[in-house]
Every structure is written in structure tokens, then in C-alpha cells.
């Protein structure tokens, strides 16, 4: 009897169980599947002042700017801060969405900061797995970077 009890005790001790623990962090965002969602992501990163998100939404046909080694991390952050200043906005409205050379899209966007509205073009390109904002006209939105918008 004693051997049976020890055998059952050993068997119970060797039993394994699996417990599924849900992850507590956010699930990764899905990459934008088109030019407009990529523009929305870029402008949301600008508005949120999110350097990491901006580096993922800004790129070219080879991929995100943050993932290539053409510029240093320090230079990337300086450029992102400039973009955040120039394209600072409270709201935006997308006008034209036109196919241009090289498979790119040109979107005309009106950015509003306070009572000031400026319109510029954003150029978007399809990368290996998603779309990116490649460049945008900064001259037209220069005054959005001012400390205060005019009343």
C-alpha cells in the first residue's frame, strides 16, 4: 500500500500543465495598405509628436527611414523634429490624390493650426511591404512652425 501511495505521489508530481497568459501590451499595428492610410499615420505621428511612429511612416521605396543606415540616429531625430514643427497642425483635410511618375501618389493636404490654414503636397511611395510618405512641400507650411499662430 505504501509503494502505491508513493507511486501516485510521484505521478502527481510529474504532471505538467500549460497556462496561457494573455499579453499585457498592445498588439502591433497593422501597416498601412495604401497611400491614404500611410498619410494618416504620418500626420498622426506629427500631431502626437511620436518620433518612433514618424520614423516608421516616413520612408522611400526601400523602406522606413528609421530602418535604413543612410543617416545617423541623431540626424534622423533632428529631421523628425523639423518635420514635427513644419507640419504641426490641429486638423487636416486631404484634397487631390493623384498618381504621378514612378508609381507615387501626390496628395494635396490643407493643414490647419489655430486660425491659420496652409496647403501643400505630400508625395507617397510604395515600399517593400507598405506605403510611406517620401517627401512634402515645406515652404508653404513654414509659418505653421511659428511659436504662436496668428489670431
Where are the predicted features?
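Sec-dependent signal peptide recognition
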Residues: 2-7
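C-terminal motif of bacterial Sec signal peptides marking the signal peptidase cleavage site
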Residues: 11-13
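Short, low-complexity N-terminal intrinsically disordered segments enriched in polar/charged residues
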Residues: 15-48
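Short solvent-exposed beta->alpha transition segments
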Residues: 29, 36-40, 51-102
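Exposed beta-sheet edge and beta->alpha loop/turn motif
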Residues: 84-151
